[in-house]
């Protein structure tokens, strides 16, 4: 499928209709879904109706936005009015939200065509999309491997050309890690830049919604459509949203790029990053080594803070108001216990237990409070780094995509796949992953580019210059 601008040009020139584009995406989904399993719900009727509305506007001579008629996938933890939103959990089986999330509302107003709700790790808890209660998504580059997580469905759908762009959410790497594993572009914006209203909460101080695409330009276009203040979200920032595409320039002259020394290794992923640094330097960037001493402590701090917030956020699912409820419970307490025991998967239960333990009276200071102090130190490390450089880079992940089932019995090994991405969430910074090479098995590596608060412009500029100087993003999986 073509880029957003290419499809927009075809629409305004009446070379293709929005309905034809939507039908092509839906046909691709129908063909690939038996093996890929990216989507939990395909919204064919809605997609055709939205596409017809775009065609009617074009026929009437109205101007349309860049996103009008563009097929998009929506992660299934974003509320969509009248369309099931399950968070890939049995406990929300059959739940149909009575309201629309801010981001999906903004995309609908822009004329985007939603083709379906994408698979994820249950309640966005996981790094492989194997924790879904309904199906396991495959990696388009190798169907025996995971697409990453928790937004694996969105990443796989974009990589497989089932949609042009998609939305995901990122709490500790859930956009960037699957973007790296699937060889696409994924951006976690600054915390508060994109409204979380209608995003089913996992860890509220870390969650952020962002775009997946196959190019940096498409990422910039989608970010511009979903960013901006929202009075319905108390953490939403009151900032002007620029046209992010204006920052996409091929030269990096004057840009200072910091390499996080704690992420430099001789591993294949480290070597892919070193090759990328040579490209950045050739584009005019000044490369510096920058130490973030507490970088590695982001992982253990995160696995106290995020489960603690999750234990509170997930307490609302009790079988009373919506979703799954056990039959013939003897008492109210019995109904609560059995509903949650049957409705939640094993990883969600593990996080709830960790969080409840960390918040308990005897351990609060030793765990939760200490983790928050570590989070502050990590943020201070980044502040010191950005006093010297414009952007920071690291590998997105320590390895390429692993085999399905390889890490499910070893949670710690699974958690380590987010080692590079988690600190960015802890500090509330923007971070982007884009393809920077392939391993011997033909699996993609990701380069992570991190910016200072609200400096998405510099992140996108650096990513675009690198992308245009290389051809990694042009490779496609053979499906």
Curated annotation (Swiss-Prot):
NCBIfam families: gatA. PANTHER family: GLUTAMYL-TRNA(GLN) AMIDOTRANSFERASE SUBUNIT A, TRANSAMIDASE. Heterotrimer of A, B and C subunits. The lineage of its organism: Bacteria, Bacillati, Cyanobacteriota, Cyanophyceae, Synechococcales. This is Glutamyl-tRNA(Gln) amidotransferase subunit A. PROSITE patterns: AMIDASES (PS00571). SUPFAM superfamilies: Amidase signature (AS) enzymes (SSF75304). GO terms for cellular component: glutamyl-tRNA(Gln) amidotransferase complex. Keywords: ATP-binding, Ligase, Nucleotide-binding, Protein biosynthesis. It comes from the Bacteria. Belongs to the amidase family. GatA subfamily. Allows the formation of correctly charged Gln-tRNA(Gln) through the transamidation of misacylated Glu-tRNA(Gln) in organisms which lack glutaminyl-tRNA synthetase. The reaction takes place in the presence of glutamine and ATP through an activated gamma-phospho-Glu-tRNA(Gln). The active site is at residues 75, 150, 174. Coiled coil: none annotated. It catalyses: L-glutamyl-tRNA(Gln) + L-glutamine + ATP + H2O = L-glutaminyl-tRNA(Gln) + L-glutamate + ADP + phosphate + H(+). InterPro entries: Amidase, Amidase_CS, Amidase_dom, AS_sf, GatA.
């Amino acid at each position: 499928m073509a880029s957003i601008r290419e499809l927009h040009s075809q629409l305004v020139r009446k070379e293709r209709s929005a309905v034809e584009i939507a039908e092509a995406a839906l046909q691709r989904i129908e063909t690939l879904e038996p093996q890929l399993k990216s989507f939990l719900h395909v919204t064919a009727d809605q997609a055709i109706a939205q596409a017809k509305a775009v065609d009617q506007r074009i026929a009437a001579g109205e101007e349309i936005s860049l996103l009008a008629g563009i097929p998009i996938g929506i992660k299934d933890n974003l509320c969509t009015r009248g369309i099931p939103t399950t968070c890939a959990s049995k406990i929300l089986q059959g739940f149909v939200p009575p309201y629309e999330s801010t981001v999906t509302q903004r995309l609908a107003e822009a004329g985007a065509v939603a083709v379906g709700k994408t698979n994820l790790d249950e309640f966005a808890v996981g790094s492989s999309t194997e924790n879904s209660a309904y199906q396991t998504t495959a990696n388009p580059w190798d169907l025996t491997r995971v697409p990453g997580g928790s937004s694996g469905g969105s990443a796989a759908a974009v990589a497989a050309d089932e949609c042009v762009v998609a939305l995901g959410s990122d709490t500790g790497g859930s956009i960037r890690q699957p973007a790296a594993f699937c060889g696409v572009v994924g951006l976690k914006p600054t915390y508060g830049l994109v409204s979380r209203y209608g995003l089913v909460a996992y860890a509220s101080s870390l969650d952020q919604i962002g775009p997946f695409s196959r190019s940096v330009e498409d990422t910039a276009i989608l970010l511009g459509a979903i960013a901006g203040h929202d009075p319905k979200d108390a953490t939403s920032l009151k900032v002007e949203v620029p046209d992010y595409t204006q920052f996409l320039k091929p030269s990096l002259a004057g840009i200072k790029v910091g390499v996080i020394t704690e992420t430099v290794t001789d591993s294949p992923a480290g070597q892919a990053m070193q090759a990328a640094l040579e490209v950045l330097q050739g584009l005019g960037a000044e490369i510096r080594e920058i130490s973030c001493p507490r970088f590695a402590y982001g992982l253990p701090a995160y696995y106290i803070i995020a489960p603690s917030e999750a234990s509170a956020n997930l307490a609302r699912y009790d079988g009373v108001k919506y979703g799954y409820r056990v039959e013939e419970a003897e008492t109210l307490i019995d109904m609560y216990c059995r509903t949650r025991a049957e409705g939640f998967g094993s990883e969600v239960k593990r996080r709830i237990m960790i969080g409840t333990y960390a918040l308990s009276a005897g351990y609060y200071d030793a765990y939760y409070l200490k983790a928050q102090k570590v989070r502050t130190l990590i943020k201070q490390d980044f502040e010191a780094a950005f006093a010297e450089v414009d952007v920071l880079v690291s590998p997105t992940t320590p390895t390429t995509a692993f085999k399905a089932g390889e890490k499910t019995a070893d949670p710690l090994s699974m958690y380590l796949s987010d080692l590079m991405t988690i600190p960015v969430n802890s500090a509330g910074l923007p971070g982007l992953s884009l393809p920077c090479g392939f391993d011997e098995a033909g699996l993609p590596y990701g380069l992570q580019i991190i910016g200072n608060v609200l400096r998405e412009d510099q992140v996108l500029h650096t990513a675009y210059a690198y992308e245009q100087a290389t051809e990694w993003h042009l490779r496609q999986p053979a499906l």
